[in-house]
Design a protein with these regions (language model features):
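Central antiparallel beta-sheet cores of small beta-barrel/beta-sandwich binding domains
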Residues: 21-99, 105, 110, 115, ...
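Bacterial Sec-dependent N-terminal signal peptides
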Residues: 1-24
């Protein structure tokens, strides 16, 4: 009987510890935007994210990637203040750069807002498509 009680309690404690870890470090992990088929992989605490296929850039705070195209927008620096991070972002060619904020919202979504600099673009059907200045991202499980 004790075995049957111990297992559910252990599972509950494990889930609780995982939930607390994501709340303590909300700017670590992967978030996505299904409408534009883009995602952000980040660890703004340890700055130890490597861009797949572009390891020459070394470890970074994170990047925004595209599910359709291999181009990336690299986070070159990040400063966290409460539930908002200020990001310096450049494309993987280094030809365009911008400053943006990434905010954790109360509903556990994230808002990326381009503050100044170049417009973020993605490639669609052999043409550049500008992304909106404000994008909402959802945590990926």
């Amino acid at each position: 009987m004790k075995k049957y009680l111990f297992l559910p309690i252990l599972c509950f404690l494990s889930m609780l510890a995982t939930a607390q870890n994501t709340q303590k470090q909300p700017f670590k992990g992967v978030i996505g935007n299904a409408e534009y088929r883009i995602y952000i992989k980040m660890n703004l605490y340890e700055n130890n994210v490597t861009v797949p296929g572009q390891e020459i850039f070394g470890e970074l705070p994170g990047f925004m990637g595209d599910s359709i195209d291999s181009r990336k927008w690299l986070f070159t620096s990040a400063k966290i203040h409460k539930n908002t991070a200020q990001l310096a972002i450049t494309n993987d060619y280094g030809s365009e750069d911008l400053v943006a904020t990434l905010t954790l919202n109360k509903d556990n979504t994230y808002t990326l807002k381009q503050v100044e600099g170049s417009n973020m673009k993605i490639a669609r059907q052999r043409k550049w498509k500008k992304l909106p200045k404000t994008l909402v991202f959802f945590p990926k499980e």
